[in-house]
């Protein structure tokens, strides 16, 4: 019994997230026969949880008179990356971004609108139903209508190459039966979502303390595409970066995404309120949360970090709304009407990340922090709040909120991460490059497997760039792979 219906396909796409699904559909729209592989039982991966994509000059922005210069974005992003990002890739991505928004609409995707995040521009095109609706209700059905064959619980385990390195096939394996099949193909597109969920790769390829890093993802980003490409002679490039998103609550008894949409997580980890380190000292302007990647970096400068909330600020956020949200999961300015109940439940359950006391001294003791230093830090901070001026780190007076009304709460913050980005060096056609900088004929990479979009820190001021690039690079690789296989077919005949 074979796994796939046929032994030969023009293109094999590995991964069914935004990049892989877009690649398969685009290739099919250009006349290619496509086999789409998903190693899990369910398709979409972490793209299911995405909220919207980046674009400039889209029809939605034009309707709202939102004008964002593509060249200004390019300069800002490349500068932000310390020139580790590829300006050519950004140029192509930007120039095609409005087309990508339109293409998704043409496939049946509906949008809520365009918005900004933090201090950024209004470039975030929020789609209805999140990524799950985009993939499962629009792109995947369209792809299957065009004949794309989808295999779930099936892994690509090795690439086959000619003597000159060109792709000639791929061996696939069933997760259920371990049965294998060799698929003849002239092109393989790798879109496997990075390696965040591979602890060994994270330890070897990044500088993050993985004990404090909490992957909030589908759990399937284990570096499969990178390993396949590296074994085929691809250049290892652009590894080391995870998309951090600030403080996150660690609860080993629950799945990591448990608190993603909770008001307690947003209150504890995403607000510009008081943070103390393992010495009971304040160490940063906490308004860094308005760039969630910078917030993750800041948290990593300390061995431990605790967010300190008093009853007054909890009441304020319940009545007046939060200072900062968490994407569309918890909206900015949203009234935190469930916050107290969520906190009370966590305290009652003795969750390991939360501490409650009626006095600052007792709270410090429960958090195992030096009482005198915690008391001094909070007294100094409260004086800054009274004065309306942060003499240490210059925090905006709007966010100087006193810690004075008991009971008091401490939340130990770890660092959340959505994905890694990078690993394979690619051309502007998303062709994978070998160790000499030459394309491996027939091998493409898209989405998080492809390097060139970032430096060591993700840029959230242009929200949606990661999934936007996934859709764009998936289409880009699918289109060029289809053109290449069509040429090969003409030559062979």
UniProtKB/Swiss-Prot annotation:
<feature type="binding site">
    <location>
        <position position="156"/>
    </location>
    <ligand>
        <name>FAD</name>
    </ligand>
</feature>
<keyword id="KW-0560">Oxidoreductase</keyword>
<protein>
    <recommendedName>
        <fullName>Vinyl phenol reductase</fullName>
        <ecNumber>1.1.1.-</ecNumber>
    </recommendedName>
</protein>
<feature type="binding site">
    <location>
        <position position="38"/>
    </location>
    <ligand>
        <name>FAD</name>
    </ligand>
</feature>
<keyword id="KW-0274">FAD</keyword>
<dbReference type="InterPro" id="IPR036188">
    <property type="entry name" value="FAD/NAD-bd_sf"/>
</dbReference>
<comment type="function">
    <text>Involved in the production of ethylphenols during the degradation of hydroxycinnamic acids. Catalyzes the reduction of vinylphenols (4-vinylphenol (4-hydroxystyrene), 4-vinylcatechol (3,4-dihydroxystyrene), and 4-vinylguaiacol (2-methoxy-4-vinylphenol)) to their corresponding ethylphenols (4-ethylphenol, 4-ethylcatechol, and 4-ethylguaiacol, respectively) in the presence of NADH. These compounds are considered the most important flavor components of fermented soy sauce, and, on the other hand, are considered off flavor and responsible for sensorial wine and cider alteration.</text>
</comment>
<dbReference type="GO" id="GO:0008202">
    <property type="term" value="P:steroid metabolic process"/>
</dbReference>
<comment type="similarity">
    <text>Belongs to the FAD-dependent oxidoreductase 2 family. FRD/SDH subfamily.</text>
</comment>
<dbReference type="GO" id="GO:0033765">
    <property type="term" value="F:steroid dehydrogenase activity, acting on the CH-CH group of donors"/>
</dbReference>
<feature type="binding site">
    <location>
        <position position="50"/>
    </location>
    <ligand>
        <name>FAD</name>
    </ligand>
</feature>
<dbReference type="InterPro" id="IPR027477">
    <property type="entry name" value="Succ_DH/fumarate_Rdtase_cat_sf"/>
</dbReference>
<dbReference type="InterPro" id="IPR050315">
    <property type="entry name" value="FAD-oxidoreductase_2"/>
</dbReference>
<feature type="binding site">
    <location>
        <position position="46"/>
    </location>
    <ligand>
        <name>FAD</name>
    </ligand>
</feature>
<dbReference type="Pfam" id="PF00890">
    <property type="entry name" value="FAD_binding_2"/>
</dbReference>
<keyword id="KW-0285">Flavoprotein</keyword>
<feature type="binding site">
    <location>
        <position position="448"/>
    </location>
    <ligand>
        <name>FAD</name>
    </ligand>
</feature>
<feature type="binding site">
    <location>
        <position position="52"/>
    </location>
    <ligand>
        <name>FAD</name>
    </ligand>
</feature>
<feature type="binding site">
    <location>
        <position position="19"/>
    </location>
    <ligand>
        <name>FAD</name>
    </ligand>
</feature>
<feature type="binding site">
    <location>
        <position position="224"/>
    </location>
    <ligand>
        <name>FAD</name>
    </ligand>
</feature>
<dbReference type="InterPro" id="IPR003953">
    <property type="entry name" value="FAD-dep_OxRdtase_2_FAD-bd"/>
</dbReference>
<feature type="binding site">
    <location>
        <position position="467"/>
    </location>
    <ligand>
        <name>FAD</name>
    </ligand>
</feature>
